[in-house]
Amino acid sequence: MLSPKDILRKDLKLVHGYPMTCAFASNWEKIEQFHSRPDDIVIATYPKSGTTWVSEIIDMILNDGDIEKCKRGFITEKVPMLEMTLPGLRTSGIEQLEKNPSPRIVKTHLPTDLLPKSFWENNCKMIYLARNAKDVSVSYYHFDLMNNLQPFPGTWEEYLEKFLTGKVAYGSWFTHVKNWWKKKEEHPILFLYYEDMKENPKEEIKKIIRFLEKNLNDEILDRIIHHTSFEVMKDNPLVNYTHLPTTVMDHSKSPFMRKGTAGDWKNYFTVAQNEKFDAIYETEMSKTALQFRTEI
């Protein structure tokens, strides 16, 4: 039986060729064998791409914008993370999902080929939120500073190198976004961009409402936009992850919800780092139609 000391600040473990958070890798057989339900709604993202934001949006849509219903529990209970396992600390994502009534919202950061086959077989609806790689790398670095489930990130310079070579949890950002983009050709996947959501939340949330086959009026839509704004969510203890023990997430090092903007990477990248990043990006993304904006 693993204890917290066995999983905190440990090296990543390979799972079918992908680097994975040590704590999550210990539970892989259960994750692979997970049974989906046909009406499950999957939220998939690469880490630090707006997952909690879109999770709360979808929960509000399913509850017709009823804020009181959305206060029924922490985001980790309402929208469990499939692969989340914290031995000796709290309920796993799978255990929580098994308790939740349908339609369940399932959060995951898994690449397409690690997602349990059951989700594909049941033709579950999926929403993928993608964010530009430069902002993701900066946000991920700060996340790994405060998240003790991850290996210590080292300096920003060291971390950026790991990010560019896919030596971070869940592997390469490039592989992740390209494979999910390709998968939408054969599966019901709504592919959204973080930057579009920041720029025009009303239009993007309308896309989610249509995809989920809901019909909500403008008053409810405006309520959802307000309740899920970064400023409101940052101060909402049900969604800002301050409910997790400080042994897991130390908000004194960096808050879970840090800035929620597009373009913050410019405060961290040197000219040389930016040039190197752009060269690698061009090579990796040359054969895809995916288009990202690094600022709004």
From Swiss-Prot:
Gene3D superfamilies in alphabetical order: P-loop containing nucleotide triphosphate hydrolases
Binding-site list for substrate: 107-109
Domain of life: Eukaryota
A Gene Ontology BP annotation from the UniProt entry: sulfation
GO CC annotation, single: cytoplasm
Reaction catalysed by this enzyme: a phenol + 3'-phosphoadenylyl sulfate = an aryl sulfate + adenosine 3',5'-bisphosphate + H(+); 3,3',5-triiodo-L-thyronine + 3'-phosphoadenylyl sulfate = 3,3',5-triiodo-L-thyronine sulfate + adenosine 3',5'-bisphosphate + H(+); 3,3',5'-triiodo-L-thyronine + 3'-phosphoadenylyl sulfate = 3,3',5'-triiodo-L-thyronine sulfate + adenosine 3',5'-bisphosphate + H(+); 3,3'-diiodo-L-thyronine + 3'-phosphoadenylyl sulfate = 3,3'-diiodo-L-thyronine sulfate + adenosine 3',5'-bisphosphate + H(+)
Main location class: cytoplasm
E.C. code: 2.8.2.1
Catalytic residues of the enzyme: 109
Molecular function terms, GO-annotated: aryl sulfotransferase activity; sulfotransferase activity
Manganese in keyword set: no
Chain positions recorded as 3'-phosphoadenylyl sulfate binding sites: 48-53, 131, 139, 194, 228-233, 258-260
Keyword Zinc: no
Disulfide cysteine pairs (residue numbers): none
Tissue expression as described in the entry: Highly expressed in the liver, peripheral blood leukocytes, colon (mucosal lining), small intestine (jejunum) and spleen. A lesser expression was observed in the lung, placenta and thymus.
Descriptive protein name: Sulfotransferase 1B1
Organism whose genome encodes this protein: Homo sapiens (Human)
Name of the coding gene: SULT1B1
